[in-house]
Amino acid sequence: MNQSIQDINAKAGAEQTNEKELICLNQTLLESVVNGDWLTYSNHCSVDLTCFEAETNGVLAEGLAFHRFYFDLPAAAASEPPTPIQVSMARPHIRWISPDSAVLSYTRLTQKMIAGAAVTASCCETRVWQRIDGTWKHVHVHRS
């Protein structure tokens, strides 16, 4: 198949746009977790989200109920000032499975203050995103 330079550039531009969109969506998802924003989190996730993470003890968790539990935990005492938390992705890498599905892998960095000292925690995450009815949805996560 012969593709013109314009076709190739248009495809590359579309992939770059989709990559930026997915990274932005994933960042919003991560921020919703640290902010306890269930509405944003659940809007970005498929209702049949699956995951492997430390909290599942090696068992595949299916659905949003598992995640909802953590959002519903009581916040810190009101007498304590909120501790700022920053979450970011180091070296995000996207592997396209199809135009409507992608695997996003990165190291998640979480920065916060503990007892007056800045602390950075890291973990490796792989998230699968799928475009469902024209909207990108988070469908699987594996965290270690």
Range-by-range predicted roles:
Residues 29, 67-70, 89-95, 107-110, ...:
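Hydrophobic/aromatic beta-strand elements that line small-molecule binding cavities or substrate pockets
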Residues 111-119:
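Short, cysteine-centered beta-strand-loop-beta hairpins and adjacent loop/turn segments enriched
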